[in-house]
Structures are given as structure tokens and as C-alpha cells.
């Protein structure tokens, strides 16, 4: 409490404790009111240290006053307390809160009057001085005279042309540097351009065309010119080739004035637009965002080319709403379409911020892998559905289903599992088995049963021969074919190949 109550001390504290809360009341301000005010300021997110000075109290009053009409009684009490504290800091003698509020209102009214009188005094002082803002200025005698364009302005214009090389931003720069200039000043700016003579020749052709159009729309009136009246400017006069500087100043400052400088400036800007279009051959339709290009760089390129487009503002707005989204890369296009057609440039750049960066690439890769995983799982589930019912296994040892012989708990079957006889295993079983042709396999003759037979199979065992050196002459192949045709089963398999 001591730190909060240290706002006032000495004579100020005595003056504080003499002020009454209400007119004619008994209660007066105490230190507890300062402690309460400090806590309330903290609750309203205001710095309690501002109570230590008169300027701080004035700042707090300025913050609280707009909310008095809709505020609570606590806010009104806080405002009254700080108003009394301000009077104590300023050593303004007040007896109660109401008188302190009246003093505050008087001070605020005086400040408003000073604020209103300051612009009027500034305007009066400005009018008393001679205008030096434009090439045509007013001298001390009240006459309008021409002030030559400064070398600094010419140097700035030359640097812009050399650095930008007739990019779209050259036009607004020329318009700013030539504000209020006469045709003679504009010609001086054009003559300082050393290079780009092809562009300068295009500009001259445009000026000549506009001058001829001016002469066609503003024919010369027949008859002599009345005394005291100036002649009407021709197209060549506006271009500064057949008019003097005095005539140009007189036209621009006459009553009614003829703004020959603004007309000539408009012709030059028209020619500069053609030059900019020639130096910027890229169409707005060709501006597309690269796959890894940040959206901010793409927007910069888009609007740089859009400035060079010779179209109305409505058409440019349509290009911005349509082409900017259409020519973005797929990632940004998806985000921009989700925003809708009414999104501003700020919302677009905020939404596409970070697209193409490492974090965005990682997120896209994770989403793609998740989709592939889900698709693979779905395919596996679909394939599993076509396998039909699961086949049950059967044990070859006990003959029961649900397990195999390796896991069978029944005692091992003795003997051969093929023929059932004991004394040998299935791999050593000599039991014969018929093949798909009905022949016994394995064959005792050493040849498989489906092998084409080249000789007659004997139907009886051969007679015993005790002779030595006897040769058995095989019968000719043709005779074998005539005696016994190929097996029916082989013919059915191989056709006429045998």
C-alpha cells in the first residue's frame, strides 16, 4: 500500500485530503482512494505510474472520457478521482469533485480552441508567403512568373529512365516530376534522355498525331483577334514548338485558363504507354506461377505486367479476380479457390504464405503418403473379399481338421503315409501310382508313360537264349508304324506330330 500511496506527498497530500467527495459532504479524499484508483487502472490495463504526474493524469482522462456515456459507476468514480488528482498536481484550488470536473472541462475547451486556431493561422501564414511549389510562381508584386525546372529534377528523371528502361513505373514517376510544368519544361525533360532514341521517335510520332487531332477538333476562328485577348493555342503551340514561354504562362494563368502544360503532359503519357507496352512484350496471360515460386513473387510479377496493360480499371479488376487465381500453381490455386471470389490481395497472400517451403512440402508429402496407404489398404481388402471362404487345413497324421501334422499332438503314425505299410517312409515308398494317362508311374522300363513309343512293347517275357554273338536285327521303322499305330492317348494329346 505504501508504494501505491506514494503518488502524493507533502503539501500535495495535504491539499488532497482537504477536498470533499461531494459538495457540502463530510467525507474527504484519503490515501485509500489512490490505492483503489491504482488497482482499477491495472484492471483496465493502464499503467498506474501515470498517476504520479499531471501529464499522466491527462492521458488517463483522455482514455476514459469516450467511455463515460456507456461505462459503469466504477468508471465514473475513477474518472472523478483522477480529475481531482490532476487539479492537485497542477495546484488548482478546488473544494470538491464537482468543482474539479468543471476545471477539467474548461481546460479541455481551451485546448480545442487552440487546436482549431492552429490550422487557420498556418493557412494565413502560408497565403502570406510566395508559392514556390511549381514552375509558375507568384513574385512579390503579385505577378505570375516562370521558374525553370531544377537540375535535381532533371537528374532524377534521367536516372529513372536509365535504371528502369521504360518499365511501367516510369509513367507515375514522370507524372510526379512534371507536376505543374509548362510545355517548355516537359520538352527539357524529354531532351535530357540520351539513349532509347527509337522510343523517343515513337513518342514524337504520338505527339504529332495528338496535335493533329487537336487542330481538327479546335479549328481557328475566322477574323481578327480582339484587343487584349490571346489567340487560341494550336497543337504545335501546346507541344511548345511554335509558342513562347510567356504565351504558355499566359495561357495557363489566364481567365479562363487553358492548361496547355497538362494537355501536353497527357499526350506524353499516352506515348509513354505505347513505349512501355513495346518494352514489356509479356502479356498478362503469360504470367504464371512456377511450381516452386513463392506466391508473393508471383503477385509482384503479375501486377508489374498489369500496370503496362492498356485497359480500363474494370477490366484490370476482372484480370485480378480471375487470372491471378487461374494462373497460380496447383497448390496455391486450391487454397485461393477455397477463399472465394471476394477475397482481397492481403487475404490471398496470407493464405498462400509458406506454400512451396519445406514445411508445406513435408505436409503435402505426408498427405500423399497417407492417401496411398489408405488406397493400398482398400485394394487389399477388396482382394481379400474375392478369395472366398478360408480353406481349412487337415492333419495328415490324425486326419482331423484345424492343424497340420507338425503341430499334431496325437502319436505319430508308423509306417509309410502313402501305402500304410511299415518298414519304410513315404519318400522311399515303391508303391506304384498311375499317371494322367493311366500308366503306372514310375515305369519299370525307365521311360515315362507319355513318352512316344519307338518300338513294340513285348506282351510276354523273352525266350531264353543261350547263343553267343547273336544279333537282333530291329525291324524297320516303317514296318513298326504299319503294324501298330501310335497310342490313342498320345494322338489325342499331340495330334499328327507322332
Curated annotation (Swiss-Prot):
Q: Where is this motif: Nuclear localization signal?
A: 26-32
Q: Which UniProt keywords apply?
A: AIDS, Capsid protein, Host cell membrane, Host cytoplasm, Host endosome, Host membrane, Host nucleus, Host-virus interaction, Lipoprotein, Membrane, Metal-binding, Methylation, Myristate, Phosphoprotein, Repeat, RNA-binding, Viral budding, Viral budding via the host ESCRT complexes, Viral nucleoprotein, Viral release from host cell, Virion, Zinc, Zinc-finger
Residue list for modification Asymmetric dimethylarginine: 390, 412
Q: Where is this motif: Nuclear export signal?
A: 16-22
The record ties this protein, via SMART domains, to: ZnF_C2HC (SM00343)
Region Disordered: list its residue ranges: 110-129, 442-498
State where the CCHC-type zinc fingers lie: 393-410, 414-431
The domain of life for this entry's organism is Viruses
Recorded hits in InterPro entries, A to Z, give: Gag_p24_C, Gag_p6, Lentvrl_matrix_N, Matrix_HIV/RSV_N, Primate_lentivir_Gag_pol-like, Retrov_capsid_C, Retrov_capsid_N, Retrovr_matrix
- Residues carrying the lipid (N-myristoyl glycine) are 2
What ranges does the record give for the region PPIA/CYPA-binding loop, renumbered to this chain? 219-227
Q: Where is this region: Dimerization/Multimerization of capsid protein p24?
A: 279-365
* Residue ranges of the region described as Interaction with host CALM1: 8-43
Which SUPFAM superfamilies does the record associate with it? Retroviral matrix proteins, Retrovirus capsid dimerization domain-like, Retrovirus capsid protein, N-terminal core domain, Retrovirus zinc finger-like domains
Print the domain comment field.
Late-budding domains (L domains) are short sequence motifs essential for viral particle budding. They recruit proteins of the host ESCRT machinery (Endosomal Sorting Complex Required for Transport) or ESCRT-associated proteins. p6-gag contains two L domains: a PTAP/PSAP motif, which interacts with the UEV domain of TSG101 and a LYPX(n)L motif which interacts with PDCD6IP/AIP1.
- Extra information: HIV-1 lineages are divided in three main groups, M (for Major), O (for Outlier), and N (for New, or Non-M, Non-O). The vast majority of strains found worldwide belong to the group M. Group O seems to be endemic to and largely confined to Cameroon and neighboring countries in West Central Africa, where these viruses represent a small minority of HIV-1 strains. The group N is represented by a limited number of isolates from Cameroonian persons. The group M is further subdivided in 9 clades or subtypes (A to D, F to H, J and K).
* Protein name per UniProt: Gag polyprotein
The organism named in the record is Human immunodeficiency virus type 1 group M subtype H (isolate VI991) (HIV-1)
**In the UniProt record, what gene is named as encoding this protein?**
gag
Amino acid at each position: 500500500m505504501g508504494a501505491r500511496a506514494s503518488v502524493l506527498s507533502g503539501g500535495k497530500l495535504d491539499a488532497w485530503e482537504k477536498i470533499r467527495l461531494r459538495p457540502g459532504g463530510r467525507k474527504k479524499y484519503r490515501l485509500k482512494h489512490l490505492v483503489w484508483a491504482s488497482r482499477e487502472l491495472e484492471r483496465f490495463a493502464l499503467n498506474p505510474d501515470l498517476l504520479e504526474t499531471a501529464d499522466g493524469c491527462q492521458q488517463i482522462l483522455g482514455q476514459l472520457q469516450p467511455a463515460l456515456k456507456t461505462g459503469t459507476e466504477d468508471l465514473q468514480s475513477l474518472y472523478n478521482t483522477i480529475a481531482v488528482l490532476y487539479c492537485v498536481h497542477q495546484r488548482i484550488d478546488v473544494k470538491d469533485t464537482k468543482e474539479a470536473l468543471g476545471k477539467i472541462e474548461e481546460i479541455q475547451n481551451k485546448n480545442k480552441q487552440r487546436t482549431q486556431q492552429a490550422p487557420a493561422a498556418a493557412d494565413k501564414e502560408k497565403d502570406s508567403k510566395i508559392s514556390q511549389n511549381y514552375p509558375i510562381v507568384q513574385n512579390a508584386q503579385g505577378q505570375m512568373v516562370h521558374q525553370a525546372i531544377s537540375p535535381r529534377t532533371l537528374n532524377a528523371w534521367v536516372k529513372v529512365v536509365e535504371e528502369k528502361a521504360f518499365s511501367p513505373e516510369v509513367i507515375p514517376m514522370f507524372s510526379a516530376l512534371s507536376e505543374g510544368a509548362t510545355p517548355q519544361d516537359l520538352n527539357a525533360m524529354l531532351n535530357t534522355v540520351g539513349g532509347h532514341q527509337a522510343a523517343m521517335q515513337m513518342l514524337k510520332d504520338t505527339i504529332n498525331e495528338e496535335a493533329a487531332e487537336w487542330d481538327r477538333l479546335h479549328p481557328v476562328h475566322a477574323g481578327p483577334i480582339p484587343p487584349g485577348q490571346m489567340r487560341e493555342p494550336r497543337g504545335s503551340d501546346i507541344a511548345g514548338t511554335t509558342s513562347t514561354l510567356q504565351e504558355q504562362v499566359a495561357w495557363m494563368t489566364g481567365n479562363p485558363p487553358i492548361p496547355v502544360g497538362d494537355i501536353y503532359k497527357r499526350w506524353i503519357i499516352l506515348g509513354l504507354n505505347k513505349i512501355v507496352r513495346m518494352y514489356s512484350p509479356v502479356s498478362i496471360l503469360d504470367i504464371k506461377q512456377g511450381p516452386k515460386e513463392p506466391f508473393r513473387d508471383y503477385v509482384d510479377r503479375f501486377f508489374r505486367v498489369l500496370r503496362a496493360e492498356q485497359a480500363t480499371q474494370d477490366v484490370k479488376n476482372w484480370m485480378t479476380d480471375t487470372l491471378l487465381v487461374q494462373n497460380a500453381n496447383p497448390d496455391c490455386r486450391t487454397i485461393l479457390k477455397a477463399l472465394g471470389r471476394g477475397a482481397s490481395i492481403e487475404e490471398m497472400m496470407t493464405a498462400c504464405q509458406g506454400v512451396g517451403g519445406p514445411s508445406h512440402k513435408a505436409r503435402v508429402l505426408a498427405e500423399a503418403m497417407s492417401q496411398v496407404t489408405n488406397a493400398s489398404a482398400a485394394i487389399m481388402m477388396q482382394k481379400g473379399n474375392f478369395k472366398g471362404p478360408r480353406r481349412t487345413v487337415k492333419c495328415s497324421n490324425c486326419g482331423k481338421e484345424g492343424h497340420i501334422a507338425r503341430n499334431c499332438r496325437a502319436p505319430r503314425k508308423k509306417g509309410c503315409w502313402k501305402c500304410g505299410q511299415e518298414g519304410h517312409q513315404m519318400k522311399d515308398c515303391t508303391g506304384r501310382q498311375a499317371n494322367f494317362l493311366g500308366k503306372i508311374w514310375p515305369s519299370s522300363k525307365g521311360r515315362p508313360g507319355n513318352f512316344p513309343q519307338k518300338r513294340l512293347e513285348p506282351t510276354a517275357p523273352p525266350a531264353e537264349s543261350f547263343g553267343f554273338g547273336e544279333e537282333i536285327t530291329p525291324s524297320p521303322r516303317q514296318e513298326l508304324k504299319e503294324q501298330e499305330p501310335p497310342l490313342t492317348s498320345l494322338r489325342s494329346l499331340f495330334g499328327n506330330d507322332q
